[in-house]
Amino acid sequence: MAEADDPQDIADRERIFKRFDANGDGQISATELGETLQTLGSVTPEEVKYMMDEIDTNKDGFISFQEFIEFARANRGLIRDVAKIF
């Protein structure tokens, strides 16, 4: 059985997604991902591409909210750390 989503985790995911989705169109582009990650420190274009490849499971060039949720569920610790920053 899958682990239930904690209400705080859900709120954190929504807040983080909105932070990355700078133009508010409901999806995260590689540009938005890179620009937001730059606020956390140096990130290379190769690192952004790798992250896009990992999270963008349908390969349309954007991270949808559902793709982000699936990534967040698989990486709960990482998302909690990111939530502390944002």
Swiss-Prot record:
Keywords: Allergen, Calcium, Metal-binding, Repeat. Residues 8-42, 43-78 form the EF-hand domain. Ca(2+) 2 binds at D56, N58, D60, E67. Ca(2+) 1 binds at D21, N23, D25, Q27, E32. It comes from the Eukaryota. PROSITE patterns: EF_HAND_1, EF_HAND_2. Pfam families: EF-hand_7. SUPFAM superfamilies: EF-hand. GO terms for molecular function: calcium ion binding. PANTHER family: EF-HAND CALCIUM-BINDING DOMAIN CONTAINING PROTEIN. This is Polcalcin Nic t 2. The lineage of its organism: Eukaryota, Viridiplantae, Streptophyta, Embryophyta, Tracheophyta.
